[in-house]
Amino acid sequence: MEERHYNYTPERKEEIQRTLMVDKALPDIDEPVEKVSYMDGCKIYFKNGGWIIARFSGTEPLLRIFCEMPEAYQAVRMCEIFEEFLELKN
């Protein structure tokens, strides 16, 4: 599993939340998507059994991105795609 954490300002949180939860915008992804859930953040399920979720921490000002894919390099790349899409810097 690949896991990343990003700090944000209140203004930046609003932008990210609008992008993912209101506009429901997603990055261009090469993997076929099975479904998207917005129950606990934005979670994309892939047809290969993998998934990625971007969600805000409930206890600290962090955006967390977690990804599981069949191969570790795929999870790393998927996190990089989300990082670029949301313009996140660690």
Residue ranges and their predicted role:
Residues 1-90:
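Phosphate-binding and adjacent anionic-ligand microenvironments
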